[in-house]
Amino acid sequence: MNPPSKIKHYLQFKDFSLEEYAYLLDRSRILKAKFKNYETWHPLHDRTLAMIFEKNSTRTRLSFEAGIHQLGGHAVFLNTRDSQLGRGEPIEDAAQVISRMTDIIMIRTFGQEIIERFATHSRVPVINGLTNEYHPCQVLADIFTFIEHRGPIQGKTVTWVGDANNMAYTWIQAAEILGFRFHFSAPKGYQLDPVMVADSSRPFVHVFENPLEACEGAHLVTTDVWTSMGYEAENEARKKAFGDWMVTEAMMQRAQPDALFMHCLPAHRGEEVEAAVIDGKQSVVWDEAENRLHVQKALMEYLLCGRY
């Protein structure tokens, strides 16, 4: 074990280097093997994870809570109904208090600026469980899943069909760091925000008007719901706009013969993806969901203990 010399947070995918991701992805493989072999591994014995939820979730809560338990620690769940966060307590004050009573903090919230402010005033590592702008833990799990099934992602093509949301922007950061092509296709009005795409990332991003063309030669096709949390009022308008951006068998046929399909879930069959695709032989969504558990264990272990 080589404990970190200073506090490190995980707020965006770009917070870690290529070399750190190589370690984390290999460590995820090792921790998953321990889990499958019922091997006890408690490097975080008596450590406490605070989980702060301003946005509800099944997979995020379950994977973090089970993960810290499997590493020998325990979790405390907080939401805006159960804490002063929902009653106007300044973020800076909450960060000071919560970080003095826990060892690591995961936050699932709205604006990225909230978690950035929290981390600035935290005395312990902070992990982004999801914000409107980024979802790094999910993309880390997706990449680990791809590697499990198909080997290194470097030099491959990942196609995103759908909204320019937190997943898409996180994939863009990952493409630059890990060295793969990112194809993006969305209807007019739902395109990428240029402000959210760093100049250094642009060579890795290729935008297509036609989703079929975007899928051409892809090694991975992935998508998400058309209406993310907080945009429910736009649901009907989005359904009309995204009609041609449902991932279909025809799109998968344009991809590589052994292309994978992923979706971060929950999914709406018949909207962003055909049932035949998500339930088909190219889909790895259940492995993808499980792997949130293993990559987040590797992440928490790394932030608190360093390398083994």
UniProtKB/Swiss-Prot annotation:
Keyword annotations for this protein, in alphabetical order, are: Amino-acid biosynthesis, Arginine biosynthesis, Cytoplasm, Transferase
SUPFAM superfamilies membership: Aspartate/ornithine carbamoyltransferase (SSF53671)
- Single Gene Ontology BP term? arginine biosynthetic process via ornithine
Q: Which cysteines are joined by disulfide bonds?
A: none
Database matches in Pfam families: OTCace, OTCace_N
Which residues does the record give as L-ornithine binding sites? 166, 224, 228-229
Q: Where does carbamoyl phosphate bind?
A: 57-60, 84, 108, 135-138, 264-265, 292
Q: Which reactions appear under catalytic activity for this entry?
A: carbamoyl phosphate + L-ornithine = L-citrulline + phosphate + H(+)
Gene Ontology molecular function, alphabetical: amino acid binding; ornithine carbamoyltransferase activity
Where found?
Answer: Cytoplasm
Identify the metabolic or biological route this protein is part of: Amino-acid biosynthesis; L-arginine biosynthesis; L-arginine from L-ornithine and carbamoyl phosphate: step 1/3
Q: EC number(s) for this protein?
A: 2.1.3.3
According to its record, what are the GO cellular component terms?
Answer: cytoplasm
Sum up the protein's function in the record's words: Reversibly catalyzes the transfer of the carbamoyl group from carbamoyl phosphate (CP) to the N(epsilon) atom of ornithine (ORN) to produce L-citrulline.
Family indicated by similarity: Belongs to the aspartate/ornithine carbamoyltransferase superfamily. OTCase family.
Q: What is this protein called?
A: Ornithine carbamoyltransferase
